[in-house]
């Protein structure tokens, strides 16, 4: 019985030690993933979203008209696809 308790304690202590070591090494390398992601997802001015004269899918349509292929139902105030039975 004592041997089983000791082995469980050592297993638990080993897991805690592993967690602490992993956390310490990850906190040292926190800047690397941020730098990597910022370089991958860098936004260029050419790729920014352009302002449209019409509202796209699931956009508010109170002041703007919906783009072609979408409707602005009176029940909801955002552009959605027309219902199949209304086409």
Swiss-Prot record:
One of its GO terms (cellular component) is extracellular region. The keyword Signal applies. Its main location: secreted. GO terms for molecular function: ion channel inhibitor activity; toxin activity. The keyword Lyase does not apply. InterPro entries: Huwentoxin-1, Huwentoxin_CS1. Residues 1-24 form the signal peptide. Belongs to the neurotoxin 10 (Hwtx-1) family. 51 (Hntx-8) subfamily. Hntx-8 sub-subfamily. This is U3-theraphotoxin-Hhn1d. It comes from Cyriopagopus hainanus (Chinese bird spider).
């Amino acid at each position: 019985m004592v041997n089983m308790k000791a082995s469980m304690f050592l297993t638990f202590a080993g897991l805690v030690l592993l967690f602490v070591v992993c956390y310490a090494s990850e906190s040292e390398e926190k800047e690397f993933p941020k730098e990597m992601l910022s370089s991958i997802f860098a936004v260029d001015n050419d790729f920014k979203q352009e302002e449209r004269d019409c509202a796209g899918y699931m956009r508010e349509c109170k002041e703007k008209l919906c783009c072609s292929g979408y409707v602005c139902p009176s029940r909801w105030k955002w552009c959605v696809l027309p219902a199949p039975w209304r086409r």
